[in-house]
From Swiss-Prot:
Superkingdom in the source lineage: Eukaryota
Compartment(s) of residence: Cytoplasm
EC number(s) recorded for this UniProt protein: 1.2.1.12
GO function terms (MF aspect): glyceraldehyde-3-phosphate dehydrogenase (NAD+) (phosphorylating) activity; NAD binding; NADP binding
Protein's UniProt keywords contain NAD: yes
Catalytic reactions on record: D-glyceraldehyde 3-phosphate + phosphate + NAD(+) = (2R)-3-phospho-glyceroyl phosphate + NADH + H(+)
Organism from which the protein derives: Globodera rostochiensis
Name of the protein this chain belongs to: Glyceraldehyde-3-phosphate dehydrogenase 1
Keywords: Cytoplasm, Glycolysis, NAD, Oxidoreductase
KW Zinc (keyword) present: no
């Protein structure tokens, strides 16, 4: 099988973990990485050592300006490294990169991300929400993808990827009248280690390791983009908490059809073992956040944490590794 050739723009948290996933799953060939701020030797160090996910289970080195990744003694990826600020200048075609993962968090509109097409890329996947690019969430609306016209797409946010599969199952089975989502979210790179200035929301500048910080999120509203029948029915907020990784969604919803918690659990379990296997998970174990470190599933339903006030009003809980 010929593996799709992929380029990565931005070698931060998501870019590095995308490369780790590519090496582990062995379904795509990463042929190039661009990052204007990280030198080659530093890329080796940052990829090899990770405070959250641990040391890379393999070997990475440099050769003639390339990164060379080895797994089980075999070189699996030889990766050309660019250090360019303008994505239009990256010569993706020279290395055969047809697909680009846009993981800088900067080029998140169709216009900005389309710059990769000038260098020879054929498709661009933005690893963040986008104001105007078509948004696709696996298990929810990927069947709507049109390869003839969708050259730049968004894979939405980690939180939307957690919420949307769960919301789809509940809406399909019982109907959602309206709902409020809260994500209890681990710290991210945009936060401050100690109190500092922040231009938008002042409390976003408070020390991440010292505080629980209320924050805005568009993740719930974004579900309306991938599940049109829920458009305008969901909104939400976040609490940033001092943990390094793994977050959890709390969906409180009013249902059209009456449903017991057992019926809801059965519906989610059926989906998790059926058409959403590998995307939506289900557990009845007494789990905590670190139990999901490195879990590649988008959303893991915590049956034991869910509660119901009455058959029309429920609180549902689902975990996700917000980096992986």
């Amino acid at each position: 099988m010929v593996k799709p050739k992929v380029g990565i723009n931005g070698f931060g948290r998501i870019g590095r973990l995308a490369l780790r996933a590519a090496v582990e799953k062995d379904t795509v060939q990463v042929v190039a990485i661009n990052d204007p701020f990280i030198e080659l030797d530093y890329m080796v160090y940052m990829f090899n050592y990770d405070s959250t996910h641990g040391r890379f289970n393999g070997k990475i080195s440099t050769s003639a300006g390339n990164l060379v990744v080895e797994k089980e003694g075999k070189a699996t990826h030889t990766i050309k490294v660019f250090n360019l600020k303008d994505p239009a200048e990256i010569k993706w075609a020279e290395v055969g990169a047809e697909y680009v993962i846009e993981s800088t968090g900067v080029f998140t509109t169709i216009e900005k991300a389309s710059a990769h097409l000038k260098g020879g890329a054929k498709k661009v996947v933005i690893s963040a929400p986008s104001a105007d690019a078509p948004m696709y969430v696996m298990g929810v609306n990927e069947d709507k993808y049109d390869p003839a016209k969708d050259n730049v797409i968004s894979n939405a946010s980690c939180t939307t990827n957690c919420l949307a599969p769960l919301a789809k199952v509940i809406n399909d089975e019982f109907g959602i009248i309206e709902g409020l989502m809260t994500t209890v979210h681990a710290v991210t790179a945009t936060q401050k280690t100690v109190d500092g200035p922040n231009g938008k929301q002042w409390r976003d500048g408070r020390g991440a390791a010292q505080n629980i910080i209320p924050a805005s999120t568009g993740a719930a509203k974004a579900v309306g983009k991938v599940i049109p029948e829920l458009n305008g029915k969901l909104t939400g907020m976040a609490f940033r908490v001092p943990t390094p990784n793994v977050s959890v969604v709390d969906l409180t919803a009013r249902l059209e059809k009456p449903a017991s918690l057992d019926a809801i659990k059965a519906a989610v379990k059926k989906a998790a073992e059926g058409n959403l296997k590998g995307i939506l998970g289900y557990t009845e174990d007494q789990v905590v956040s670190t139990d999901f470190l490195g879990d590649s599933r988008s959303s893991i339903f915590d049956a034991g944490a869910c509660i119901s006030l009455n058959p029309h009003f429920v609180k549902l809980v689902s975990w996700y590794d917000n980096e992986f």
